[in-house]
Amino acid sequence: MYVDEKRVGDEYLTPYSNDYNEWVQYQTYDVTEEVSKQGMLRVLLGNGWYKARFGFSAFEDKGFYGNEWKLIAELHLTYADGSEEVIGTDESWQVRRSKIAFSNLYDGEHRDDTLSELPLEKAVFCEAPKGELTERMSLPVTIHETFEPKELLHTPAGELVFDMGQEFTGIFKLHVNVPAGTKIHVQTGEILQRGNFYNDNLRSAKSEYIYISDGTEMDLVPHFTFYGYRYVKIEGIPDLKKEDFTGLSYYSNITATGWMKTGSDLVNQLISNVRWGLKCNFVDVPTDCPQRDERMGWTGDAQVFSPTAMYLEDTYAFYAKYLYDMAKEQSVLGGKVPHVVPSCGVEDAACVWGDAACIIPWNLYLFYGDKSILEDQFVSMKSWVEYITKVDGDNHGWRSVFHFGDWLALDNPVQARSRSWVQRTRSLLQTCIMRSAQESWQKRPVC
């Protein structure tokens, strides 16, 4: 959002990632300093999680939740005489295509500054998303660190590749001064192979930025995508210099609370790697990876890592939002906890993964001592245990359905599945956690 040419706030990727069929977050900003009598309010809309391909339907070129750009906004004005006015989105607002021709969380962004500016047209009313408009729970996603390239590599394949010296999640700033019509192609990757740029591990994710210049010298910054990367391949700038590029690391606004330093450089590097693994995967949702065509909130990953995350950072609000979304998903799935949250249409459940509904709230209580999270999530915890009990029935049906095992373990005779004793012990653990949670919250024994 902009007032005249000034960007409002410092957040990226709003309104963030959650089940848009159940709830839609709104954000508020103080624009007192930006607003003038002749000020123009502008909002730039991208595909985001709502309209772009995402999740396990990622090979389909359509959004899971919808295929329209939608905006609901209000400008609240209080005048010097005390009178108030609210200017809301309606058909008096005007729209037109921007210079951003394409955006996608997996595939990147395309910007073409040679596109002619189209005339303004009246906005039209559209059907609202299914979810209830809800005050934000997501922490702001903002830039926390910047990185300068450690080296400009000339690879054996003749490529120009920046080595940032550090893997991180975020975007970049690229200074360009090239003739009109020049095409600049930026690609990101995590490793080199035989000294050359490599990104085949990203599967279908293109993870790129394409720019067509109109000849204006400027700094390019992507708006509606993010990358997980260390290496950056750039084509179209023959006199490329290290000072032209800056890496911008962003993630949710969490605060470091735990530190440890040892006498071993290897152990210290391991601790640093763990913390950076957290930062890279805490972009609004606790994800499995920040770079390939997935980047989803896997519940098993989230619960296993949650104690470590709570030692390192203040993650209470971050996980509270994730759990709220999880409970919303359960409310329409009969208590079932999907493998990923938001589910993006995935309705399967399994032990360990679904156990996040009980384990994460309990860990939040143990680490932060706030019993309200147990009260807030108790229906979610209880419905998960009841779902397991229902599926198990009199014939131990819970043991016969698919459950993830040690992923790609070569000694597991049943592919990626776990053995039945795992389901039995995990079910007992969730029941014990739920019982302890209710006793802690209600301050009395329960039956």
PLM region spans:
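Second-shell loop/turn segments in exported
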Residues: 257-263, 307-310, 424
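Amphipathic, well-packed alpha-helical segments that form the structural scaffold of globular domains
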Residues: 275, 279-283, 324-327, 362, ...
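Acidic, mature catalytic/reactive cores of soluble proteins
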Residues: 180, 185-192, 261, 378-390, ...
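An alpha-helical repeat/solenoid feature that recognizes helix-turn-helix modules
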Residues: 298-304, 311, 354, 427-431
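The feature captures the catalytic groove of carbohydrate-active enzymes
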Residues: 107, 207, 287-289, 333-357, ...
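Stable alpha-helical elements in mature extracytoplasmic
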Residues: 270, 301, 322, 357, ...
